Amino acid sequence: MRALLLCNYYDADAGFVGERFRQHGYSFTECHRERRATWPSLDGHDLVLSLGSDWSVYWPHVESEVSEEAAVIRTAHEQGIPVFGICYGNQIMAHALGGTVERAREPEIGWYEIVTDMPEVIVPGPWFQWHSDVVTVPGHAEELARTSVGPQAWRIGTSFCTQFHPEVTEAMVRRWIEGGGAEEAAKHGRDPDQLLADTRRNVAESRPNANAIVDWYVESVVRG
């Protein structure tokens, strides 16, 4: 089965989520947001996976990139091609399908417990988060999990997304910190070294938790 991986060229790692989709038989074509002219069509593809980004959908200087990715997500959704979004992928899916995205009243950076309506699939956590934006879900969506800041998971048909990062690995968090995230984390009162220590402690548990979400998505949502 063929899947499109929508991502930034400098952060194209789908981590545990990509690993599990591959175990279910999917192969990915990377589609870099900065090089969208090279994206293939949706024809013959069975899944769209939209990853996180340090972008915000309302930034004026990425308006064309946001518009074109939103169009891909909207078209896939309308054609019944499953779409799975993570963090920024969640935000652009909300933007594409009738919800809204705005600056959150406070960022979520680190490992957080969430309130879940499907604890057998989406466990309370902890889950890793790194974002400063919040969505309102489209009116016809089913919200599945949340924190005090905002929605954490929702779905419409075969489109599903999470604000938290089920895919995250220790290597990814280290890369984000070394790529400028240390300053951002410190600005918001988070200790980068503690973020890494917490990640080392939690990834052994978060990996099977991520697998459970992908298994449910493939077996119950995609295949129905």
Q: At which residue positions do the language-model features occur?
A:
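Short glycine-/acidic-enriched loop or helix-start segments at secondary-structure transitions
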Residues: 14-16, 59-61, 93-96, 138-139, ...
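Flexible gly/pro-rich beta->alpha loop and the following alpha-helix that scaffold active-site loops
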Residues: 19-84
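N-terminal beta1-alpha1 ligand-phosphate binding loop
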Residues: 3-21, 31-34
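Amide-donor transfer/coupling interface in amidating biosynthetic enzymes
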Residues: 5, 50, 102, 116-224
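Catalytic nucleophile loop
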Residues: 75-100
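Short, electropositive alpha-helical surface patch
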Residues: 102-108
